[in-house]
Amino acid sequence: MRQSMPNIVVVLISALLVGACAASGSRVSPAESQVLFVCEHGNVKSLMAASYFNRLASQRGLPYHALSRGTAPDSTTVPPAIVAGLLGEGFHVAEFHPIAVSVADISKSRRVVLINTALPETMHPAGIPQELWTDVPPASSDYAAASAALRRHVEALIGDLSPSDKN
């Protein structure tokens, strides 16, 4: 019985680490390239875009995974209306916790997409393509319009990925 106790501890710690990674959105395998979506608070537009991107990339068999981050997270949760809207589309984000964007997030990314925001001056690593989406309306006041705009952009982004990245 004594020898099985360390095994149980290892299993519990492993489970906690896997859960923490899933909640933070950091599930990029070595074979995947990371796309980083950034909005101001990190809990609405970037979360919606990352959700749409991950589903579409998976459906198309692309080696990409997206993360959601914020330049100035002001909450530890996702607004209930956004949770409900995304749940209606098959995304379970109730346990998601917004995270502030870091230089490491940007450095690990193949592409950075800024949604109605800008990166802080100290976070502009050279050589990483960035694009700005300025036409996404607030999801809190018009979820359907924000969803449509984000889906349109995500479709174009996936279509724009280099052919060598799609294999």
Spans of model-derived segments:
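Bacterial N-terminal signal peptides
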Residues: I8-G19
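Short, polar loop motifs at secondary-structure junctions
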Residues: I115-E121
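A short, aliphatic-rich alpha-helical micro-motif
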Residues: I106-S107
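Bacterial signal peptide processing site
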Residues: A22-S24
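Bacterial N-terminal signal peptides that target proteins for export
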Residues: M1-V9
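Phosphate-binding/catalytic loops
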Residues: E121-N167
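Conserved acidic residues
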Residues: R110-V112
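Conserved active-site segments centered on acidic
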Residues: S26-V101
